[in-house]
UniProtKB/Swiss-Prot annotation:
Name of the protein this chain belongs to: Integrase
Encoding gene, per UniProt annotation: int
The keyword Hydrolase is assigned to this record: yes
All residue ranges annotated as the Core-binding (CB) domain in the record: 55-143
Any single Pfam family the record assigns to this protein: Phage_integrase
Keywords: DNA integration, DNA recombination, DNA-binding, Hydrolase, Transferase, Viral genome integration, Virus entry into host cell
Active-site residues annotated for this sequence: R203, K226, H277, R280, H303, Y312
Function: Integrase is necessary for integration of the phage into the host genome by site-specific recombination. In conjunction with excisionase, integrase is also necessary for excision of the prophage from the host genome.
UniProt GO MF annotations: DNA binding; hydrolase activity; transferase activity
Domain (Tyr recombinase): residue spans on this chain: 165-325
Highest taxon above the source species: Viruses
Length: 336
């Protein structure tokens, strides 16, 4: 029988349109009807058979990177993540890659198999959702470019449900404690970089890589940002005058390790993955607690999507205060 059910899901059509000694055609389909239709068409039009696609999944990823991924801020990171997944899945041909294969891969990855480094064995569902999005984007983009003729094999695959990530911010006492440890550290640039992050909401990499050309009087302009848009943030006279004025090019040397060391000495505990990002969270949280405008905060942080900024809305002093004034019990209480 040329059309049969696939134990892993879906249907398989396998036939030899040019006889038993001719080339075999084997394709997977979501429904039996699609498989039968393909069988009928191929038998009736054997000469129209397309050349067999022997590209590996890795070759597709590399085609995507050359045509589109290279323009993305995290394009290389995506490419390397997909290369690793390709190796873990047994280096499949692109035509054999499907949702079942990726599902088995991510199940094992969640259990600590297929680790990319000895430092981190198990990965979070959020990380695997990113990898799913990466592969989907590859097939979507190559389809738009005419480099992939089939359907997106992951189009119906759902991402894992994840809890909203905990965001920690520092209190005034913790900020003072942290700045004190940074001041005592022997790295000459550490305290200044931390102050820039706390004063402007900058990402660590944006502050650490700051160049002289990005400074104007009482202003810092961040370039080459994650959102690919420049943004200018005002700073105090005190902070401006503390910045080096005798350097050309980059103002600070790398101090990530020094920050980790200073933070450890404070005893402040943070959720995983929020080592330097806590400074950005702290800026945003205090901005809203002090009555800041959410739209202004969006521009300062450089968020392209307001939903990212709305995570900080609950810090506003009057956040959801209307719930007290507009709930139905108010009318009943006032009528007594």
């Amino acid at each position: 029988m040329t059309v049969r059910k696939n134990p892993a899901g879906g249907w398989i059509c396998e036939l030899y349109p040019n006889g038993a000694k001719g080339k075999r055609i084997r394709k997977k389909f979501a429904t039996k009807g699609e498989a039968l239709a393909f069988e009928q068409y191929t038998v009736q039009n054997p000469w129209q058979e397309e050349k067999e696609d022997r590209r590996t999944l890795k070759e597709l990823v590399d085609s995507w990177y050359s045509a589109h991924g290279i323009t993305l801020k995290d394009g290389l990171k995506r490419q390397l993540a997909m290369h690793h997944a390709f190796e873990c899945m047994g280096e499949p041909l692109a035509r054999d890659f499907d949702a079942q294969m990726f599902s088995r891969y991510r199940e094992k990855r969640l259990k600590g198999e297929y680790a990319r480094s000895n430092r981190v064995k198990e990965v979070s569902p959020r990380t695997l959702n990113l990898e799913l999005a990466y592969f989907r984007a590859v097939f979507n983009e190559l389809n738009r470019l005419g480099e992939w003729k089939g359907e997106n094999p992951l189009k119906n695959m759902r991402p894992f449900r994840t809890e909203e990530m905990e965001m920690t911010w520092l209190t005034h006492d913790q900020i003072s404690q942290l700045l004190g440890e940074c001041n005592r550290h022997d790295h000459p640039d550490l305290e200044t970089v931390v102050r820039i992050c706390l004063a402007t909401g900058a990402r660590w990499s944006e502050a650490e890589s700051l160049r002289k050309s990005q400074l104007a009087k009482y202003k810092i302009t961040y370039t080459n940002t994650k959102g690919r848009k420049n943004r200018t943030v005002p700073i105090s006279k005190e902070l401006y005058e503390s910045l080096p004025d005798d350097k050309k090019g980059r103002l600070f040397s790398d101090c990530y390790g020094a920050f980790r060391s200073a933070l450890e000495r404070t005893g402040i505990e943070l959720p995983a993955g929020q080592l330097t990002h806590v400074l950005r969270h702290t800026f945003a949280s205090h901005f809203m607690m002090n009555g800041g405008n959410i739209l202004v905060l969006q521009r300062v942080l450089g968020h392209t999507d307001i939903k990212m900024t709305m995570r900080y809305a609950h810090f506003a002093p009057d956040h959801l205060e209307d719930a007290v004034k507009l709930n139905p019990l108010v009318h009943i209480t006032n009528s007594k």
